[in-house]
Swiss-Prot record:
Biological function: Catalyzes the oxidation of long-chain aliphatic aldehydes to acids. May be implicated in controlling luminescence as it catalyzes the oxidation of the fatty aldehyde substrate for the light-emitting reaction.
UniProt keyword Transmembrane present: no
Protein name: NADP-dependent fatty aldehyde dehydrogenase
GO molecular function: aldehyde dehydrogenase (NADP+) activity
Catalysis: reaction(s): an aldehyde + NADP(+) + H2O = a carboxylate + NADPH + 2 H(+)
Binding-site residues for NADP(+), renumbered to this chain: G229, S230, V231, G232, G233, G234
Species for this entry: Vibrio harveyi (Beneckea harveyi)
Entry-linked PANTHER family: ALDEHYDE DEHYDROGENASE-RELATED (PTHR43353:SF3), SUCCINATE-SEMIALDEHYDE DEHYDROGENASE, MITOCHONDRIAL (PTHR43353)
Length: 510
């Protein structure tokens, strides 16, 4: 079996490196044009579909995923080497995410309906009747992620939030798990059929050529893009989206080292802090975008004990099977390169190819300043501890950091005066601040922010996880002096949708 021809490609068994026996078409610009044109034809009706019907679609997709969970888990396990228990949890997360957005749609909050009542007698000029709501942008392109074959892929957060907003979705499946994406796409297609909605509302495109993604981002009917992946790939597509004749929003989640700051009081108070750290950095073989990639701690006996414990735990780690051969090769190359730099110490676990070893680097603040490349994310089971001379040194290093998804602080009350000096800086560089915990898990809820300043994301004012993610795919429209009968339901005076609105700047439910 040839693992690649001009017209088809095959998934790879993540454990053996061999091709799996199911061919997938290599879609081209032709299929992109067909999908985008079809999506554009249904976009207007889909964005005007009533809330209850759109919410029902999301819930039906969730049920279809759960009904085929055994098939999905079995295939994803082969393609990604992720354990079945992890994949079981990811299916639950994906289904719950869809249901969360169904609730958001039913609530009508996403309309952000605002009414300014008229005052025809106002001097010197009459005040007009102006009402505002959010509407869907149109067809959205979504790029599946390698490390979350469900929660950040074909039916993941970008797809769920875009469908909730009323945008048709075209997914470019990730080559790391095309079989998984295909089963998930079948679930969505079945849900559309059950809800008697056009199939063009969702399309999965597959292929192992960069030209597919480029054609999708460039197509004039695509009105926004959601992407989770590398800085290099994401930045290239971001540039393409902004160089189009009609530039479009590109919501990319790219790279983050997620700094952690451990104060002396926490080192003394938490005997298992090193265990927690190593568990977080190696979770999912270090292939979480929220992995704590660098730890800053003070030069104290407690920190030295923390380092020694962490090094001991690293040596005991089992070999890691990474998601793809490409990710494995990149990880090994970056780890070897960093380990050969001056002024850095590295501890490895044991591993034989095709598995990889976990790695823990340790350096001083002085050496950190000399090596700006150490701030680049290494995707895999590794992290770096930077030993600072004092709190002022730690605060100074925080000023050097680029954007991240998260920033974590470990401290007790005795260090709060110093912590209060650090927090304003962390607010500037991170989308989520974590206190006395670890950033790896990302709760799907109403308050979550999964984003941050570049290179964590390309749009720091948004989130790719949680209810607020829906607003990426919406834009405001104001309606001035329209007759009541021509207004959308969300803005009519009698409020037939019974949604929360703002009237003359004040909250109202009528």
């Amino acid at each position: 079996m040839n693992p690649q021809t001009d017209n088809v490609f095959y998934a790879t068994n993540a454990f053996t490196g061999e091709a799996l026996p199911l061919a997938f078409p290599v879609h081209t610009e032709v299929e992109v044009n067909q999908a985008a044109t079809a999506a554009a034809k249904v976009a207007r009706d889909f964005r005007r579909l009533n809330n209850s019907k759109r919410a029902s679609l999301l819930r039906t997709i969730a049920s279809e995923l759960e009904a085929r969970s055994d098939d999905i888990i079995a295939r994803a396990h082969l393609e990604t080497a992720l354990p079945e228990v992890r994949l079981t949890g990811e299916i639950a997360r994906t289904a719950n995410q869809l249901r969360l957005f169904a609730d958001v749609v039913n609530s009508g909050s996403y309309h952000q309906a605002i009414l300014d009542t008229p005052n025809p007698t106002r001097a010197p000029l009459p005040k007009p009747d102006i009402r505002r709501q959010q509407i869907a942008l149109g067809p959205v392109a979504v790029f599946g992620a390698s490390n979350f074959p469900l929660a950040f892929s074909a039916a993941g957060g970008d797809t769920a939030s875009a469908l909730a907003a009323g945008c048709p979705v075209i997914v470019k499946g990730h080559t790391a798990h095309p079989g998984t994406s295909q089963i998930v796409a079948e679930c969505i297609e079945q849900a559309l059929k059950q809800e008697q909605l056009p199939q063009a509302i969702f399309t999965l495109l597959q292929g192992n050529q960069r030209a597919l993604g480029q054609a999708l981002v460039s197509h004039p009917e695509i009105k926004a893009v959601g992407f989770t992946g590398s800085v290099g790939g994401g930045r290239a597509l971001f540039n393409l989206a902004h160089e189009r004749p009609e530039p479009i929003p590109f919501y990319g989640e790219l790279g983050a080292i997620n700094p952690t700051f451990i104060f002396p009081s926490a080192m003394r108070a938490k005997a298992d802090l090193a265990d927690q750290f190593v568990a977080s950095m190696t979770m999912g073989c270090g292939q979480f975008c929220t992995k704590p990639g660098v730890v800053f701690a003070l030069n104290t006996p407690e920190t030295q004990a923390f380092i020694e414990t962490a090094q001991s735990l690293i040596r005991q780690q089992s070999p890691s099977t990474l998601l793809t051969p490409g990710i494995r090769d990149s990880y090994q190359s970056q780890v070897v390169s960093r380990g050969s730099d001056d002024g850095i110490d590295v501890t490895f676990s044991q591993a034989e190819s095709p598995c990889v070893a976990s790695a823990l680097f340790v350096t001083s603040s002085e050496n950190w300043r000399k090596h700006p490349a150490w701030e680049e994310e290494i995707f895999g089971p590794q992290s770096l501890i930077v030993v600072c001379e004092n709190v002022a040194d730690m605060l100074s290093l925080s000023e050097m950091l680029a954007g991240s998804l998260t920033a974590t602080i470990h401290a007790t009350e005795e260090d709060y005066p110093q912590v209060s000096q650090l927090i304003p800086r962390l607010e500037e560089i991170a989308g989520r601040l974590v206190f006395n915990g670890w950033p790896t898990g990302v709760e799907v809820g109403y308050a979550m922010v999964h984003g941050g300043p570049y290179p964590a994301s390309t749009h720091s004012a948004s989130t790719s996880v949680g209810a607020e993610a829906i607003h990426r795919w919406l834009r405001p429209v104001a309606y001035q002096a329209l007759p009541e009968s021509l207004l959308p339901d969300s803005l009519k005076a009698e409020n037939p949708l019974e949604i929360a609105r703002a009237v003359d700047g004040k909250a109202a439910h009528s």
